[in-house]
């Protein structure tokens, strides 16, 4: 049984997220998802939707076997329990796949890292695009 792990913020869940998770799920038999904690989102604006609500939405998706919140202190902590065979990265996630594989191996968590390419273009396939459209329409 091949266990897949995907991670992300999943703020304002949109078709781009669904595409990413669907492609990740296709890589194996079980899909686990780590939803970023509000406190760990430092590379972009803080999420609009709370971490608990984002977790609830991701867990409600039929393609996801189990979603859980990430660790506030060590991003590798949940991986010790999940023990994924493959980690799926989104096209825009800032991890270097080779460096991540090396760090995982050092921690006794060998896993292949696969980057999921950008989905077909759609007008509202990013949280930023959704926010811009809402501001444009409703100011």
Curated annotation (Swiss-Prot):
The gene is ribL. Transmembrane segments: none annotated. Catalyzes the transfer of the AMP portion of ATP to flavin mononucleotide (FMN) to produce flavin adenine dinucleotide (FAD) coenzyme. It comes from the Archaea. Pathway: Cofactor biosynthesis; FAD biosynthesis; FAD from FMN: step 1/1. GO terms for biological process: FAD biosynthetic process; FMN metabolic process. One of its GO terms (molecular function) is ATP binding. Keywords: ATP-binding, FAD, Flavoprotein, FMN, Nucleotide-binding, Nucleotidyltransferase, Transferase. Pfam families: CTP_transf_like. Belongs to the archaeal FAD synthase family. This is FAD synthase. Its EC number is 2.7.7.2. ATP binds at residues 9-10, 14-17, 92. SUPFAM superfamilies: Nucleotidylyl transferase (SSF52374). It comes from Methanosarcina barkeri (strain Fusaro / DSM 804). It is an enzyme of class 2 (transferase). InterPro entries: Archaeal_FAD_synthase, Cyt_trans-like, FAD_synth_RibL, Rossmann-like_a/b/a_fold. It catalyses: FMN + ATP + H(+) = FAD + diphosphate. Homodimer. Its cofactor is a divalent metal cation.
